[in-house]
From Swiss-Prot:
This is Urotensin-2 receptor. Its main location: membrane. Residues 377-389 have a biased composition (Pro residues). It comes from Homo sapiens. The keyword Transmembrane applies. Keywords: Cell membrane, Disulfide bond, G-protein coupled receptor, Glycoprotein, Membrane, Receptor, Transducer, Transmembrane, Transmembrane helix. It comes from the Eukaryota. The gene is UTS2R. High affinity receptor for urotensin-2 and urotensin-2B. The activity of this receptor is mediated by a G-protein that activate a phosphatidylinositol-calcium second messenger system. The chain crosses the membrane at residues 55-77, 88-113, 125-146, 168-186, 210-232, 259-284, 298-318. Residues 1-54, 114-124, 187-209, 285-297 are extracellular. Residues 1-10, 30-39, 355-368 have a biased composition (Polar residues). GO terms for cellular component: membrane; plasma membrane. GO terms for biological process: blood circulation; blood vessel diameter maintenance; neuropeptide signaling pathway; regulation of blood pressure; signal transduction.
């Protein structure tokens, strides 16, 4: 997936056949170090072992990730589509992961055969798919975090939103991701140089560096700062609610918050090393041996696919949390099997019940189902002593 210029003699990016041609590092025709790279040097035992290992690992990730994300899509659409708000975002996350994992067969084929079989269209589509799904994932996570924030601190605002606004937000995340991906889809092309073929962008090194820096800002830095700010304010709100006089039992929404944060942290853990590796080669030519550079490239590539492979497990926990919460609401108070009162659904309610202190003490429940139960009726006046029968 990556786009790091690297010494062609060590790891020629996107090379299909033939030997590499020496070029100045960082020059306009610098090769691209990526998951679409294929070593064109004569095969040795070490190369065969590395190719077999990376091919096996990526294939296993692809199988597990595709099955897991497909399962997530089926379960989410069947179980939560009609009742929970989160299903729109979980479906979008699973779809982005699924599309990203479907590129693995093309990578493995390039590694094993040491040839690029997919032509100019393959260069544009596969590179574009990488960046499209990456941005769609992080933008969706940002929207999820923003909605969790609003559900906790601004519950009265969320109930006034139209019913289908989440679908519009999901569509907007994909359109924005496509807009950021279009430059690389239009600029990437298949170039033949003697006996080898390379996928190279049509722009020069400065434009290439500027574009990669922009992608880092839009996929890691910008969303990271925004999500960090939202969760910092949520943490402060939780601390204040714990100090309140009337403490409330922890609701399932708090667990949903932790799961969303876990998905975000997993994304950063898998993609931050990848992007640091890309930018390092753009702004500083690290004196790495070819073998070391190849290992780093393999590891960062596997990390990005590992994210899409591991996400379905968190998605399953998130959807299960919502299913349990919805079942608890249907049972109503006092039927939680000894686990304490469970918040029940009031059909004609419009607002979420708060603790009476502030909106920040409200429980972070899904906004479409966390409707506020009507106020408790006034306590009747105490009756006088009854006359003896």
């Amino acid at each position: 997936m990556a786009l790091t210029p690297e010494s062609p003699s060590s790891f020629p990016g996107l090379a299909a056949t033939g030997s590499s041609v020496p070029e100045p590092p960082g020059g306009p025709n610098a090769t691209l170090n990526s998951s679409w790279a294929s070593p064109t040097e004569p095969s040795s035992l070490e190369d065969l072992v590395a190719t077999g290992t990376i091919g096996t690992l990526l294939s296993a990730m692809g199988v597990v990730g595709v099955v897991g994300n497909a399962y997530t899509l089926v379960v989410t659409c069947r179980s939560l589509r009609a009742v929970a708000s989160m299903y729109v975002y979980v479906v979008n996350l699973a779809l982005a992961d699924l599309l990203y994992l479907l590129s693995i067969p093309f990578i493995v084929a390039t590694y094993v055969t040491k040839e690029w079989h997919f032509g100019d269209v393959g260069c544009r589509v596969l590179f574009g798919l990488d960046f499209l799904t990456m941005h769609a994932s992080i933008f969706t996570l940002t929207v999820m975090s923003s909605e969790r924030y609003a559900a906790v601190l601004r519950p009265l605002d969320t109930v006034q939103r139209p019913k289908g606004y989440r679908k519009l937000l999901a569509l907007g995340t994909w359109l924005l991701a496509l807009l950021l991906t279009l430059p690389v889809m239009l600029a990437m092309r298949l170039v033949r140089r003697g006996p080898k073929s390379l996928c190279l962008p049509a722009w020069g090194p400065r434009a290439h560096r500027a574009y990669l820096t922009l992608l880092f800002a839009t996929s890691i830095a910008g969303p990271g700062l925004l999500i960090g700010l939202l969760y910092a304010r949520l943490a402060r709100a939780y601390r204040r609610s714990q100090r309140a006089s009337f403490k409330r039992a922890r609701r399932p929404g708090a667990r949903a918050l932790r799961l969303v944060l876990g998905i975000v942290l997993l994304f950063w853990a898998c993609f931050l090393p990848f992007w640091l590796w890309q930018l390092l080669a753009q702004y500083h030519q690290a004196p790495l041996a070819p073998r070391t550079a190849r290992i780093v490239n393999y590891l960062t590539t596997c990390l990005t696919y590992g994210n899409s492979c591991a996400n379905p497990f968190l998605y399953t926990l998130l959807t299960r949390n919502y299913r349990d919460h919805l079942r608890g609401r249907v049972r109503g108070p006092g039927s939680g099997g000894g686990r304490g009162p469970v918040p029940s659904l009031q059909p004609r309610a419009r607002f979420q019940r708060c603790s009476g202190r502030s909106l920040s003490s409200c429980s972070p429940q899904p906004t479409d189902s966390l409707v506020l139960a009507p106020a408790a009726p006034a306590r009747p006046a105490p009756e006088g002593p009854r006359a003896p029968a």
